[in-house]
């Protein structure tokens, strides 16, 4: 049975929401397609027609989860002192509710140890998510107009995702 474009888009969103949550709760390797489709209320065929593979689901789910986290954190407000915004973001990140809600928490922290064993597409998606998180956090740094050298230092301190994708280290 053929589904409408709107229904296919809804199915895709359901799959990604279920996968993002399950991957954060259980890890990528421990989460099966059957678990994802059951949580999404769809069939295996629905998942494979949308994505083609579990790896493609994982890559897309990482990006969706990281964007959702970024929206939750919000953007830096130039009118607000950087330290105040940074304090708010760090407080949110380190809160007990964030810590205890692993399925809704930071996809980077939840999957960081899984990523080196994942296929290239998943590692690349993780690298993009790490870079996005760094760029977002850079907006809350006390000196928003940092030099390139300072920026490199921040990347070393906070991590830059290159460990997730060994090929990325050659790009910079």
Sequence positions of predicted segments:
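Short amphipathic alpha-helix in the helical subdomain of ABC transporter nucleotide-binding domains
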Residues: 8, 82, 86, 149-156
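Helix-turn-helix
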Residues: 14, 18-56, 60
């Amino acid at each position: 049975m053929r589904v409408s474009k709107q229904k296919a888009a809804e199915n895709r969103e359901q799959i990604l929401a279920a996968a993002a949550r399950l991957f954060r709760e259980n890890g990528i390797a421990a989460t099966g397609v059957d678990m994802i489709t059951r949580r999404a209320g769809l069939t295996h065929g629905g998942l494979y027609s949308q994505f083609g593979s579990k790896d493609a689901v994982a890559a897309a789910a990482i990006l969706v989860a990281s964007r959702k986290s970024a929206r939750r954190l919000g953007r830096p407000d130039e009118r607000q002192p950087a330290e105040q915004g940074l304090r708010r973001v760090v407080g949110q990140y380190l809160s007990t509710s964030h810590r205890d809600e692993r399925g809704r928490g930071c996809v980077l922290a939840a999957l960081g140890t899984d990523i080196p064993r994942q296929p290239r597409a998943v590692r690349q998606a993780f690298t993009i998510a790490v870079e996005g998180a760094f760029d977002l956090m850079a907006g809350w740094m006390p000196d928003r107009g940092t030099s390139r050298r300072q920026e490199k230092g921040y990347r070393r301190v906070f991590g830059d995702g290159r460990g997730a994708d060994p090929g990325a280290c050659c790009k910079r």
